[in-house]
């Protein structure tokens, strides 16, 4: 399983991350599955790496994290991207989140912890996202562990291998929707395999450029997870699918686990 980092990731991100664990947890409740996070790609703007989508009184609303632009940012490794705290984005983000979810059933229960992460001044986008992702893994009680990749995997240059191989194929078309995409400058030739053992799965387990705000995906449909849950503004806009994971947690609380992993019911 290979994913890109994301800021308050959408449900499709968490559905993909929990897929392998969901297949094993019923028979092995103590199981923990590794989910690999691409740590050696370059920064790509207009992606979930620094934005999330929530449901507000005015419809869908994007919350973005501004980053420091030093030199050629699009040839900067994702782990080196610094958050721009000179912009008052934290205040605006908290205001937007509170406005959207103050009446949801579990907002008050989780609000302080979520806002504490935003207020902590974490210097890099990578570290900020990791803190957020691990918070939701813990609160939803998912048996997954985030493991940063040790080297970059080039999407175009890895072929198919049999299921169960020590190196599973990571194969996806060149992400043309992200014009700034390029192999990191420190990668000379070819792609190196991820460490660890995988099982063959949807999209050959490479979701890095499948989950994108400007590109629809069928992950929730493929996993039979495109189903409604309570949303504050559903009466006005209808159910809105694949929003930030905070939408699920603030509205469903402890039931979020059963939504993402229905095999536990």
Question: Which residues does each PLM region occupy?
Answer:
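Residues lining hydrophobic/aromatic ligand-binding pockets adjacent to catalytic sites
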Residues: 1-265
